């Protein structure tokens, strides 16, 4: 079993190499047993939206972040702009819905799979597997998840589930290294 700090260090060591070994990363993410005392300072919630809180930029090779989900909050259906996406549940439960890429304009997205991940569950996603949405289906409890994106990305595409329409989105952080970012007047935060 590894601590949160050891997990961050070992992820950095893995990505000193050029190739992403999905199985190795999944095993490492699975070896960490969530301890709120180790990651609490990075978990900053907002009552109106889910938050993306940066933990480590991995020398520009990846982003490691903690996402905080209030009751009933969900991401849009989105791609990963050719990045690998690993998710570890640190607290609560999240439901991942995977979709096929839109086949025609103005048609609903087709669901491939629905799966709920509980405490310490780990999932993997990339664009070859389709699109996905993460959702906290609880109406009373929050959820916290650790996300690893290789390579890091600053934009992605969101998809309308009813029509398949694609919209390019800028990806921002709510906090960096445990400190909330003040975007007042910043174009990045809008």
UniProtKB/Swiss-Prot annotation:
- The Enzyme Commission number assigned here is 1.13.11.20
Share an example GO biological-process annotation for this protein: L-cysteine catabolic process
- Which keywords describe this protein according to UniProt? Dioxygenase, Iron, Metal-binding, Oxidoreductase, Thioether bond
The record ties this protein, via Gene3D superfamilies, to: Jelly Rolls (2.60.120.10)
Q: Cross-link 3'-(S-cysteinyl)-tyrosine (Cys-Tyr), residue numbers?
A: 85-149
Q: Which domain of life is it from?
A: Eukaryota
Give the matching SUPFAM superfamilies.
RmlC-like cupins
Binding-site residues for Fe cation, renumbered to this chain: 78, 80, 132
List required co-factors: Fe cation
Is Manganese a UniProt keyword of this protein? Answer: no
Give, as in the UniProt entry, the pathway in which the protein acts: Organosulfur biosynthesis; taurine biosynthesis; hypotaurine from L-cysteine: step 1/2
Top-level EC class: oxidoreductase
Task: Cite the InterPro entries for this sequence.
Answer: CDO_1, RmlC-like_jellyroll, RmlC_Cupin_sf
Posttranslational modification: The thioether cross-link between Cys-85 and Tyr-149 plays a structural role through stabilizing the Fe(2+) ion, and prevents the production of highly damaging free hydroxyl radicals by holding the oxygen radical via hydroxyl hydrogen.
Iron listed as a keyword: yes
Co-factor note (free text): Binds 1 Fe cation per subunit.
Q: Which GO MF terms does the UniProt record name? A: cysteine dioxygenase activity; ferrous iron binding
> What catalytic activity does the UniProt entry give for this protein?
L-cysteine + O2 = 3-sulfino-L-alanine + H(+)
Question: In which family does this protein belong, per the annotation?
Answer: Belongs to the cysteine dioxygenase family.
Question: How is this protein named in the record?
Answer: Cysteine dioxygenase
| Species whose genome carries this gene | Caenorhabditis briggsae
């Amino acid at each position: 079993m590894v601590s949160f700090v050891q997990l961050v260090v070992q992820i950095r060591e893995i990505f000193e190499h050029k190739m992403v070994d999905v199985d190795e990363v999944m095993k490492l993410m699975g070896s960490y047993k969530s301890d709120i005392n180790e990651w609490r300072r990075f978990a900053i919630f907002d009552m109106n939206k889910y938050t993306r809180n940066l933990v480590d930029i991995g020398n520009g090779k990846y982003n490691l972040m903690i996402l905080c989900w209030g009751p009933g909050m969900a991401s849009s259906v989105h791609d990963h702009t050719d990045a690998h996406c690993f998710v570890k549940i640190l607290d609560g439960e999240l439901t991942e819905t995977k979709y096929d890429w839109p086949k025609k304009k103005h048609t609903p997205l087709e669901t491939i799979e629905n799966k709920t991940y509980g405490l310490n569950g780990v999932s993997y996603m990339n664009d070859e597997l389709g699109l996905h949405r993460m959702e906290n289906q609880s109406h009373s409890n929050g959820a916290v998840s650790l996300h690893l994106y290789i390579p890091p990305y600053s934009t992605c595409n969101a998809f309308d589930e009813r029509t398949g329409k694609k919209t390019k989105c800028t990806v921002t952080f709510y906090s960096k290294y445990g400190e909330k970012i003040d975007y007042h007047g910043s174009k990045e935060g809008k």
